[in-house]
């Protein structure tokens, strides 16, 4: 019995649909949640946008919400710093070198390399599937929010699950990667069933940077950047409120006036 069979037997009692339980484990849920949160942040949905507007005498005072998209610039700088120049391969055997250069060009691996480093910087992890299409070696970088690598308690990489739900049809799909083959599952027609099985040349390649919390996974650059930018956005927003409300457009308040409701914490002035 190999380690994967032992893992499935020990954790899931040899259930052929073991992958359904694997993807809802707490460690996976937390990691996917972080990926989605980082994706939302890079899309412009920042914490500062949650600042509440304040009310005064039946009128709404719209508080300032300053968004700084500097995180994108930082990540792009790191991507360009590492892959700003074309990758150059070297080998003592000229024939081997030419072969690998042809593979690199035909498979458009310059783009693949950039996608990998970009997702590692954004999400901490990236996953590459290598396959052959009409005799050409190619690679596909998987969506980090749909990727579930399977490790055992010793940190050995055993399997990989790609899972997503189509937003238009609400059909859920699972691509379960084993070392030598891939099972394609779907719940189209209400019940989960095996659609097809294809050959594979190995598990998806898992790229990640180093993390002191978990050696099997990486950590996003945004983990360190977001708290700083959130604080900066909050300060600049409140500073803008203080300038426009206190200096340019002050609100008159009578001393001793009865306040019938609490003042929002985000109100400045």
What are the roles of these predicted feature ranges?
Residues 1-137:
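Extended, helix-rich architectural segments
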Residues 10, 21-23, 31, 184, ...:
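Intrinsic disorder/low-complexity segments enriched in polar/small residues
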Residues 117-218:
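Extended, regular secondary-structure scaffolds
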Residues 8-9, 79, 142, 197, ...:
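Residue-level detector of alpha-helical transmembrane segments in integral membrane proteins
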Residues 195-269:
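Extended, charged amphipathic alpha-helical segments
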Residues 42-47, 55-65, 172, 234-252:
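Charged, low-complexity, helix/coiled-coil-prone segments
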